[in-house]
Structure formats: structure tokens, C-alpha cells
Amino acid sequence: MDVVFLGINNIGMKIYNWLCQRNKVDVIAMVTEMEQLDIVQKESPDLIISVGFEHLVPAEILAVPSEGAINLHPSYLPYNRGMSPNVWPLIEGTPAGVTLHYMDEEFDTGDIIAQQKVQTEFSDTGKDLHSRLEDAQFELFTQTWPKIESSNIETTPQEDTEGTYHTTADFVDACELNPEREVTIKEFLNTLRALTFPPFDNAYVEIDGTRYYVDIEIREETDESGDKAEGLVSSY
């Protein structure tokens, strides 16, 4: 099977290297920029695989491969299509997960091949969830690959009624904390932990013309042995 791989991020490179070790797969090109997509029409691969490719692929490119084009997206579709899918489950309470789906002319809307949910905890930051989603992406792809390779795929259309979509602008807006806005403590903590991704500075507040960056660490209470504590008893 001849494959053109679209990708640029860490998990994309990991899956690319994994595919290159498969005996029945020939990854004939790796594409990281839009202007490189013409190689698909030149090479006419059997399959396009996209992992971390942030551009919308034109319909004429998607129509070339005989086995179609598939994308691995780090969200539980139809929730959190688009950008920063590690952030919105923590802010909005939507399910976190990963999805393998066919590509169409919109972002992350194609028929679902396989997906799995990823558990979140109240102590999670955006970085924690990002790491967990990367692990789940690799697991889902490698487990599903035999079905893809043998063309033994059953798909499920996405439900549009509950889907969500976010842009880079949504993330930028979320990073600006309004000191005058009234929110619950839980909502505030959810926003801070979702935007905490060291060493990057994301969430910030501006006070008297000065910008202050904010992140957070939430720790679950434990007893002296390191186990979760049931409660505290003080004696005087």
C-alpha cells in the first residue's frame, strides 16, 4: 500500500516512523505544508494519512487515493473539532478522546472509523491531557491499522446536533482573563488548568497596564504514606 503522510507534530512523527517499519506499507512522501500537496496528484497513492496536519485539504486532493484519506484527531468527535482539543474538555466539560475518521471538505467532520474516550481528572492541566491524548492516538491508530490495511472498515456518520468547533482565535480569547468577569470558582479553576502548559505562557490578566501570566497546580490530598487521605484530624 502506497501512502502519502500529512503531519508535523510529535505524535505524527511517531506514527510516521511506525508506518515506515511495516512490511506492506510504502510511505512515499511526507507532507508538512500546503504547497507540497501536489505530490499526491503526481504519485497517486492508495491512501492519505493525516496526523497533526493543520490545513484544510482540497477536495481534488482527497479524491486521488483509491482508499481515501484518513485523519487522526485528538478529540472525541463530534466534540472539539478544530484547534486545541486538549483545552476544551477541561473548560467546557465535553468528553475527551481521540478519533480516526475519513477526511472530507471540512475540518474533522468525516465518517468515524474508530474512537475512544480518555478519562480526565480535576487535577489535570492542558499539558496532562495533551500527553494522555497523544498516548491514546498512537494506541488507537496501531490497533485499527490492520482493518485499514485490509480495507475492512465500518464507519459511523458523525452526529452534528451535539458537535463543537474551536478556532485559534477561540484559544487566544480564552487566554485573556477578564478581572471584572463574574464566574464560579470551579469555572475559573477549569480555565486556568486547561491553559496551564509549561513552559508556555498562556493565561494572563492585565492589571494597571501590566500583563501577568497565570498557571495553576492542583494536587489531590494524600496522607503521610502517599495514599489518598480520607480526612484530617488535628489534636491540640
Where are these regions (language model features)?
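One-carbon transfer enzymes
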Residues: 1-236
